[in-house]
Amino acid sequence: MNRRRFIKGSMAMAAVCGSSGIASLFSQAAFAAESDIADGKIVRFDFAGLQSMAQALAKKPWGGAPGPLPDTLANLTPQAYNSIQYDAAHSLWNGVANRQLDIQFFHVGMGFRRRVRMFSVDTTTHLAREIHFRPELFKYNDAGVDTTQLEGQSDLGFAGFRVFKAPELARRDVVSFLGASYFRAVDDTYQYGLSARGLAIDTYTDGQEEFPDFTAFWFDTAKPGDTTFTVYALLDSASVTGAYKFVIHCEKTQVIMDVENHLYARKDIKQLGIAPMTSMFSCGNNERRVCDTIHPQIHDSDRLAMWRGNGEWICRPLNNPQKLQFNAYMDDNPKGFGLLQLDRDFSHYQDVMGWYNKRPSLWVEPRSKWGKGAVSLMEIPTTGETLDNVVCFWQPEKAIKAGDTLAFNYRLYWSAQPPVQSPLARVMATRTGMGGFPEGWAPGEHYPDKWARRFAIDFVGGDLKAAAPKGIEPVITLSSGEAKQVEILYVEPFDGYRIQFDWYPTSDSTAPVDMRMFLRCQGEAISETWLYQYFPPAPDKRRYVDDRIMR
């Protein structure tokens, strides 16, 4: 799965940005957008025209991988690339009075070879001008770039852009679009975490995964005092083209994105991923296999949350499996899903570099009927925090054929907590460890004679306390094995209940065990549903080894 290295290794995958379709679509006219850096021809622009462009482009052959960059850019190290800074004096909306938002651009170079085109749009006249690359827009500092190789190369374009919000208009960005169709945002902590994508193609098939590119962006000029702006994007790849509209609300404690896309299939697509997101889970309370560090937990996200079309809420803790796992959770018109980072306690991470306790959650809220399909989750084995190893997206049930046209509307919430939560009791944490002994005797004078794995799931909220006198019943379903020593424990420090059970194997199989549990009181569900996937060790590993040396 080396293709994942591209995400945190700063390698943008190739896709086409055919310049022939963009300039020819519009006619020249007057222009009045408040941008001092837009220097291209004046052209007309609107979203309907962008949709027509994407549809026309889908009927043409894909343009292929991006061309070579000048050597001085292609050979940059990550450290050298990061030292190239955009000159804030040339920001996109530097001339807008009382601006609350501003845009700066990323330089092409290193793995970011796609030459992305940028346009400034006057929202009153719907007229646009391209912003061409020129070295004076950047500060090269000690990057070692030979700027003489860049002179006159106005077609270099840019690698992406980022958004700044007052009072941090030139210091701390809140939104970033960089590499293929990747983008991300922060909450009020200003800490980036997981990423979203415009589209995912063939993520888990017998073929090569395809990474579409955003090849051009059009920015509606932000109004004075406004914290919301609109950006349009053209997406292109070997299999599909797309027209995207992002209305981005940079609020005080979160960033909200209203996304509308129109997709045009060039060819048959085995697996299409809508609203995809990419995250990292190395280790946590439930999975300690590769966590031999000073950090108790290392992850951008700790769970997949789903609000199904039938109203059921699901919590599915993430894993770092030894073998790649792909799970599809079937649904019909989902109400929402996302990868969440709900544990915000610094002491649970002890990380002063990654600040995982500050990383945002990402919640997808469909704004139209999506029909039948599945929330798909792929978990890739990883040895550490430098590689993203979790992918999640909506996969439509209907097969995508060449010539098909699709459209999706959804809202993305980048925030500490999702905008909605179950009114029932919710899963706070999942823990696993040695089983087969009474709680409070861990593990006693000697290890248990029979091997077992213990699971402890903490529930909070809802009507748990009111239900307790009537009787709380854990309803546990397992795909294999047996659940024994089931206990219900009230835990005063978090004012909730811990459901604890030991899993005992009933065969030598090492196939993943699908676990499902919810709480019931007098026949009624009183909690969201906990889903988990456990990977039993080989039979010869199902024993406890006492390695004490007593003399």
Curated annotation (Swiss-Prot):
The protein's name in its UniProt record: Glucans biosynthesis protein D
Cited function: Probably involved in the control of the structural glucose backbone of osmoregulated periplasmic glucans (OPGs).
Family: Belongs to the OpgD/OpgG family.
GO annotations of cellular component type: outer membrane-bounded periplasmic space
PANTHER family: GLUCANS BIOSYNTHESIS PROTEIN (PTHR30504), GLUCANS BIOSYNTHESIS PROTEIN D (PTHR30504:SF3)
Pathways involved: Glycan metabolism; osmoregulated periplasmic glucan (OPG) biosynthesis
Signal peptide (UniProt feature, chain positions): 1-32
Gene Ontology biological process: beta-glucan biosynthetic process
Post-translational modification: Predicted to be exported by the Tat system. The position of the signal peptide cleavage has not been experimentally proven.
Annotated localization: Periplasm
Species in which this protein is naturally found: Salmonella typhi
Keywords, alphabetical: Periplasm, Signal
Pfam family, one: MdoG
Record bears the keyword S-adenosyl-L-methionine: no
Gene Ontology molecular function, alphabetical: carbohydrate binding; catalytic activity
